[in-house]
């Protein structure tokens, strides 16, 4: 369409009518329906949604931003509001600003699907809010459109990580691109433990539900990763996200986590199934909602098709009811401090060989007893910087300094071996 019409044209003498209530809303809906009829020759009816999940809007935004020809821009709504928007696109190899048609203040239609979208601005207390409307030619078109949303969302979600964060106003949901994939070969941990974890993941996603039905096993699994920070729990999760053909969702537990946010997250995660749901810092679950969380896990369909991965740095804070029970967390794995062999493997992979000989790397691996992978990473950065600036290194001195700092900062006994109750 070259000449895109306006639903509500501005006139000075009518500006009071633009701020009215139902009268203005009824006028706008009528004009939208008339404009759709004029364009396509069929009547589009307004539908209301009782579903808090509105993924179809995400797909519309993606189509508009990508320049897809499938959604047609039918009309603007208010003449004096925005027609275009800009955003910083972090998903591109070279992030930059993009300019695209506005979703708000516009009417879009998928004529072949028989549905249309309108994000209508309204004015309240000096602010501009918006009201989302969905139109369809008939119930059959609406059902067919909604049935097609989930497969497309599932494919879209495989390319990104869906991040749920519980905040003061409820759960926010964003999709973040996997900027740097981690290969399984880059995960350094006990070989037997690594094999067992990946095998359980692969069994879940590479077999269909018939295996679970045949052996009467719930099609829902869960593992808990625990241990001191900086030892590869996050790296392991990233490698899983980049190596399975399924969506991965990430849920950050906070003090704002409530029964409402728990229900909202699981409802959204079920729509992505089969999928992985990573629950970060599960020990931070507020005490007053832990029973609700356990009941949600026990629900007949609450986790169908979901592989749960819980992570914690403080396993002693975990509710014992979570563990060793089918449908909750079936297994717990300690991701502990690396031994000398693993430290040596990490240091070789990280690139210490650029400025250290083979013998010096082996010696550094011995000296760094008690170091986490994160601390070894810090040691690499410091050593590389010194090598670049001075042409030499004093890695033994650096290790000694870091060891002293580590001893000063350590607190509590949970990091000590044989103090954790999960085996």
UniProtKB/Swiss-Prot annotation:
Primary location group: cytoplasm
The keyword Endoplasmic reticulum appears for this protein: no
Sequence segments annotated as region (Disordered): 403-423
InterPro entries associated with the record: AAA+_ATPase, AAA_ATPase_domain, ATPase_AAA_core, P-loop_NTPase
Keyword ATP-binding attached: yes
Subcellular localization: Cytoplasm
Binding site for ATP: 227-234
Record's GO cellular component terms: cytoplasm
Gene3D superfamilies: P-loop containing nucleotide triphosphate hydrolases (3.40.50.300)
Factors inducing expression: Expression is sigma W-dependent. Induced by alkali stress. Strongly induced at the end of the exponential growth phase.
Protein EC: 3.-.-.-
Coiled-coil spans in chain: none
UniProt xrefs under SUPFAM superfamilies: P-loop containing nucleoside triphosphate hydrolases
SMART domains: AAA
Keywords attached to this entry: ATP-binding, Cytoplasm, Hydrolase, Nucleotide-binding
Record-level Gene Ontology MF annotations: ATP binding; ATP hydrolysis activity
Pfam family, one: AAA
Record family assignment: Belongs to the AAA ATPase family.
Function (record text): Shows ATPase activity.
PANTHER family in the cross-refs: AAA-FAMILY ATPASE, ATP-DEPENDENT ZINC METALLOPROTEASE FTSH
Protein name stated in the entry: Uncharacterized ATPase YjoB
Organism: Bacillus subtilis (strain 168)
């Amino acid at each position: 369409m070259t000449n895109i019409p306006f639903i509500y044209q501005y006139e000075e003498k009518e500006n009071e009518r633009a701020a009215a209530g139902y009268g203005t809303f009824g006028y706008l809906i009528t004009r939208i329906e008339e404009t759709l009829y004029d364009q396509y020759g069929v009547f589009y009816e307004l539908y209301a949604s009782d579903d808090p999940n509105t993924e179809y809007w995400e797909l519309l935004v993606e189509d508009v931003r990508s320049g897809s020809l499938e959604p047609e821009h039918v009309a603007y709504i208010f003449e004096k509001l925005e027609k275009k928007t800009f955003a910083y696109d972090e998903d591109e190899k070279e992030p930059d600003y993009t300019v695209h048609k506005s979703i708000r203040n516009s009417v879009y239609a998928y004529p072949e699907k028989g549905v249309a979208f309108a994000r209508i601005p309204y004015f309240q207390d000096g602010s501009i809010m918006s009201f989302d409307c969905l139109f369809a030619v008939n119930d059959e078109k609406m059902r067919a459109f909604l049935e097609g949303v989930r497969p497309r969302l599932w494919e879209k979600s495989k390319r990104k990580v869906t991040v749920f964060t519980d905040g003061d106003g409820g759960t926010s949901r964003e999709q973040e691109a996997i900027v740097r994939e981690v290969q399984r070969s880059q995960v350094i941990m006990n070989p037997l433990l690594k094999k067992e974890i990946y095998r359980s993941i692969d069994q879940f996603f590479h077999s269909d539900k018939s295996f679970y039905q045949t052996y009467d096993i719930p099609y829902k699994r869960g593992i808990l990763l625990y241990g001191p920070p900086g030892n590869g729990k996050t790296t392991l999760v990233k490698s899983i996200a980049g190596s399975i053909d399924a969506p991965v969702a990430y849920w950050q537990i906070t003090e704002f986590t409530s029964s409402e946010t728990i229900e909202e997250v699981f409802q959204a995660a079920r729509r992505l199934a089969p999928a992985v749901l990573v629950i970060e810092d599960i020990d931070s679950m507020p005490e007053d909602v832990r029973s609700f969380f356990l009941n949600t896990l026990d629900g007949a369909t609450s986790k169908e098709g979901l592989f749960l991965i819980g992570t914690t740095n403080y396993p002693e804070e975990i509710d014992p009811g979570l563990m060793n029970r089918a449908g909750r967390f079936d297994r717990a794995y300690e991701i502990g401090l690396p031994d000398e062999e693993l430290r040596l493997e990490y240091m070789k992979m990280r690139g210490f060989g650029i400025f250290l000989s083979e013998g010096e790397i082996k010696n550094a691996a011995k000296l760094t007893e008690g170091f986490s992978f994160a601390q070894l990473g810090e040691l690499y950065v410091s050593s590389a910087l010194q090598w670049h600036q001075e042409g030499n290194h004093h890695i033994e001195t650096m290790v000694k300094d870091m060891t002293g700092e580590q001893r000063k900062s350590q607190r509590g006994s949970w990091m000590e071996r044989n103090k954790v109750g999960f085996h």
